[in-house]
A protein has these predicted regions:
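Acidic low-complexity intrinsically disordered segments
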Residues: 1-124
């Protein structure tokens, strides 16, 4: 894999449960042009107001964790909070994350809350 200055040098993963087991799910793969990174994912949160991401360098080195707090997220029963995460790159080393509370169907309507955060990806 050839990594020129336009290529993302790290995978961006989210820590989640997959069929009840802890898993590291890839959201953005290394090797793509940074300016082409635009993706989204929906997560069901399990009684938490935090999303845990991992920056996994393709060239080796230490993984870097990122914790995103969702301040003011309404407290709901376990697994009754759905959020949409959208990712885009603002530069070769700056990731923009937008998160939106989707609620949980008719049971728990969306709060309308949104969070945005920019992360600088060291070694990206």
């Amino acid at each position: 894999l050839f990594l020129d200055s336009n290529k993302l040098r790290s995978n961006i993963l989210v820590m989640a449960l997959d069929r009840g087991e802890p898993a590291r799910i890839s959201l953005v793969d290394a090797g793509v042009n940074w300016y082409e990174v635009k993706c989204s994912a929906e997560l069901v949160l399990d009684s938490t107001a935090e999303i845990n991401l991992i920056l996994h360098p393709l060239t080796g080195g230490r993984e870097e964790p990122f914790h995103i707090r969702l301040d003011r997220l309404p407290v709901r029963e376990g697994r009754m909070t759905r959020v949409r995460m959208e990712f885009s790159m603002l530069s070769p080393v700056k990731l923009h994350i937008r998160i939106e509370d989707l609620g949980f169907g008719d049971i728990f309507p969306s709060s309308g809350l949104r969070w945005e955060q920019d992360l600088v990806l060291e070694g990206a």
